[in-house]
């Protein structure tokens, strides 16, 4: 199918997936999501859709606002990273070209808002991690501050994302 990067479609698909998993005979009705980097970005969007059977999330190192955290830096355009992501993706059909979408939407508008999770909708317990030297830091901190769960934890660390994710102590 077509690939719409980092938008509400991810959240809606994830909602359906959570509810499908919860109905399986081997599931106790409780589901959770862990995600790092791009997968974390999807986790934010799924949790914002509030699937009834999502019991908690572990959101590690995930950008929330593509416009301010990835495509621009203090208002200065830098679409190269997103262009690299699109180039690296293997997709049989159409894939959204975020770097070039910046040319069509140079300001934070409805298009970019559709790619930002509605943080305030996230009410499940959340364990959020952010690396102090990584561009996902802002998404981790903003997400932690804005989600409405009374049970949320933020862990900031000094390392990059991948070694911490695959450390056996964290599995």
Locate predicted features:
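Active-site-proximal cap/loop segments of hydrolase catalytic domains
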Residues: 1-171
């Amino acid at each position: 199918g077509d690939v719409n990067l980092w938008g509400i479609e991810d959240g809606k698909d994830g909602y359906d997936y959570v509810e499908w998993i919860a109905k399986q005979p081997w599931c106790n009705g409780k589901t959770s999501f862990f995600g790092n980097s791009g997968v974390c970005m999807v986790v934010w969007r799924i949790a914002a859709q509030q699937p009834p059977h999502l019991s908690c999330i572990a959101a590690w190192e995930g950008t929330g606002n593509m416009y301010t955290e990835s495509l621009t830096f203090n208002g200065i355009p830098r679409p190269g990273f997103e262009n690299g992501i699109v180039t690296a993706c293997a997709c049989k059909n159409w894939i959204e070209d975020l770097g070039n979408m910046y040319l069509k939407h140079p300001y934070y508008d409805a298009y970019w808002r559709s790619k930002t999770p509605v943080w305030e909708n996230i009410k499940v317990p959340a364990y959020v991690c952010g690396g102090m030297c990584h561009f996902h830091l802002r998404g981790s901190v903003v997400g932690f501050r804005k989600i409405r769960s009374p049970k949320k934890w933020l862990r900031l660390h000094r390392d990059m994302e991948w070694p911490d994710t695959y450390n056996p102590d964290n599995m």
